[in-house]
Amino acid sequence: MPDNDDIQDLLKAFERLCAGRGNGFLSEDSFERIIDHFDDINSLSKAMEAAEMGVLQYPYSCTLLVKKADLLIANRQYKRALVVLDKAEILDRNDIDIYVLRTDAYLALDMQDKAVALLEDAISQFDGDERIDLLFELADVYDDYEAFEKIFDCLKLILDYDPNNEEALYKICFWTDFTGRSEESIRLHLKIIEDFPYNDLAWFNLAAAYQGLRLFEKSIDAYQYAIAINEKFDFAYRNMADAMMRLHRYKEAIESLERVIELARPEDLIYQAIGFCYEKIKNYAQARFYYRKASHLNPDDAKIYLKVAGTYIKESKHAQAIKYLDT
């Protein structure tokens, strides 16, 4: 049957074969499409039936064996899946899905050490995008059993291979803060920026690392580069405002926070931060205005009402403070 036949025709042919009425022939590609169709509609039993039949007709098809193993894992038949993957590896040890699925099976069987050893060995066999995919997989394994330093190491390796990898850049920012490896992150991102000066995420991560070391002036400079490259980078404005507040640069912080409101969905914490800045520069009316905006978004937070009352007290308007708290 031609590979470009409509999926409905393929399904009819498959059903005839299952019923023992068909004398036709389904190609390897047709079985792949049928399995994918049943998998997409969450009909795992039919997908497995198609996989079993496909493997029976094409016992040397690595692709069909891998699909069968994937379905076995979905059905929590992990040991059977490992046996099928062993057969697939004999046919094509360069299929990255074999290693990813075997890792999933090992983790499900609580065999983390085997999963790590498998991936570490496989990483040396692949290059390019496939090596990066395996490093992400290894990072996830380390995350599962809380080897957090090793997650940072995996992400750093990915960025050594692909300095513009957005997923790695996003993730390493979090893990830098979590592991406290700010100095290492600074060296890494300075190197990336040297080669790719318009990488806004690298500038952001550099700024965040400086911020982690309380080097707020350097942090602000790096955030300003990030927003010069990407003027809609709301998290850069948000973090830069925090650094400015720590340096008591409240008017500049207000400008950054107002930009956050323009770019992102309003949050009570942002309104509270603006209110705090106005309170620090003794513009109590504006402070109250933003604290009230925060309270509209989060009416159950009693601390916001105390902040409003506090501004009245600082103006010696005690009656209004009491009246506000009473309401």
Range-by-range predicted roles:
Residues 54, 87-88, 122, 157-158, ...:
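Canonical positions in the second alpha-helix
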Residues 29, 63, 97, 131-133, ...:
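Start-of-helix register in tetratricopeptide repeats
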Residues 57, 90-92, 125-127, 161, ...:
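Structural marker of alpha-solenoid helical repeat scaffolds
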